[in-house]
Amino acid sequence: MKTFTPKPADLTHDWYVIDATDVVLGRLATQAAILLRGKNKPTYAPHADSGNHVIIINADKIALTGNKMGKELYSHSGRPGGLRRDSYAELLEKNPERIIKNAVKGMLPKNRLAKVQLDRLRIFRGAEHPHTPQKPQVFEIAQVSQQAK
């Protein structure tokens, strides 16, 4: 069987908007990674860039299950200051976009396409975003019956 390669005319990059209010971080990152790779399209090919643009709004209202909010640590050594460790609660106040971006980045493939796909991810703290002229489609994430705390 021959490898399917979509033609350049078949590669359309649609726009989706996801509301992150009370959505569990892992479920949000999984769905965003699927949309960024273009796996929701019938013309998907792993070697071709058929991904979509994803806008995530209300990033500051993301939910984490269990007691990860205080226990989990996000560490980054940006040099010259050295190692810096923040809990998710502190990082959610300062920079919630960074939490979501790193979760989505971990779910993308580790290759050259990942950078291009990650560049199509746009995360905003509030409900407003400047991409209304692109007419993004609303993407609903199905929630499990358990409540996120």
UniProtKB/Swiss-Prot annotation:
Coiled coil: none annotated. SUPFAM superfamilies: Ribosomal protein L13. It holds the Pfam family Ribosomal_L13. GO terms for molecular function: mRNA binding; structural constituent of ribosome. GO terms for biological process: negative regulation of translation; translation. InterPro entries: Ribosomal_uL13, Ribosomal_uL13_bac-type, Ribosomal_uL13_sf. The keyword GTP-binding does not apply. GO terms for cellular component: cytosolic large ribosomal subunit. The keyword Ribosomal protein applies. Keywords: Ribonucleoprotein, Ribosomal protein. This protein is one of the early assembly proteins of the 50S ribosomal subunit, although it is not seen to bind rRNA by itself. It is important during the early stages of 50S assembly. PANTHER family: LARGE RIBOSOMAL SUBUNIT PROTEIN UL13M, RIBOSOMAL PROTEIN L13. Part of the 50S ribosomal subunit. Belongs to the universal ribosomal protein uL13 family. This is Large ribosomal subunit protein uL13. It comes from Bifidobacterium longum (strain NCC 2705).
